[in-house]
């Protein structure tokens, strides 16, 4: 997959590990609109970039950047959702539906698992979301889908209640898995 194969309205930078692989790093640089999740703005700004918006409860954003970027900082104190979810809904409210998530993994495994698991919720909310990491990508899907691939590419399918799974050209057959991690 190449950078120009991915369409996007915006990129959300999570507060996990800052991207180092060229794919998520390039997406972040080329993005037409960048939303930083709370404290991720500190690292993004330190690297010489200015986000279009900073979203979160403000618990990890430095006081200096909170003040300096107060016009683009949207503080949402709700503790029932994480900052990534707040950022997705912020973008959906603006009509930005094709969203790339970067920096959403690493540092904390509980946040990594949570952020990956939330992709299904974002899809159900109307977002066309792709999570790019330094090691791969996650794409939530429903219904009939076709994905570009190449011989030898590693592919994992996490099944969240789908039935009748079918694929052509995979080494291992698909079935209606009983657990999400089996694919």
What is each of the regions a protein language model found here?
Residues 110-120:
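Short Gly/Thr/Asp-enriched flexible loops that form oxyanion-binding sites at enzyme active sites
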Residues 136, 141-183:
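Long, charged alpha-helical interface segments
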Residues 1-68:
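N-terminal beta-strand-loop-alpha-helix module at the start
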Residues 121-138:
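Short, acidic/small-residue loops that bind anionic groups at enzyme active sites
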Residues 73-95:
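Short phosphate-binding loop-to-helix
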Residues 71-77, 128-130, 156-158:
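A glycine-rich helix N-cap at a beta->alpha junction
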């Amino acid at each position: 997959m190449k950078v120009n194969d991915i369409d996007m309205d915006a990129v959300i930078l999570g507060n996990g590990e800052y991207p180092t692989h060229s794919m998520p790093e390039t997406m972040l640089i080329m993005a037409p609109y960048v939303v930083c999740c709370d404290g991720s703005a500190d690292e993004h700004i330190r690297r010489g970039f200015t986000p279009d918006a900073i979203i979160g409860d403000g618990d990890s954003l430095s006081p200096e950047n909170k003040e300096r970027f107060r016009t683009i900082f949207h503080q949402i104190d709700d503790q029932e959702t994480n900052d990534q979810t707040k950022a997705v809904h912020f973008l959906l409210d603006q009509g930005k539906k094709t969203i790339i998530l970067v920096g959403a993994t690493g540092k904390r495994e509980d946040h990594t698992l949570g952020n990956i698991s939330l992709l299904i919720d974002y899809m159900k909310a109307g977002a066309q979301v792709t999570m790019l990491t330094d090691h791969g990508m996650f794409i939530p899907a429903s219904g009939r889908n076709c994905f570009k691939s190449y011989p030898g590419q590693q592919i994992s399918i996490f099944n969240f209640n789908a039935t009748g799974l079918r694929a052509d050209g995979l080494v291992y057959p698909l079935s209606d898995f009983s657990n999400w991690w089996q694919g």
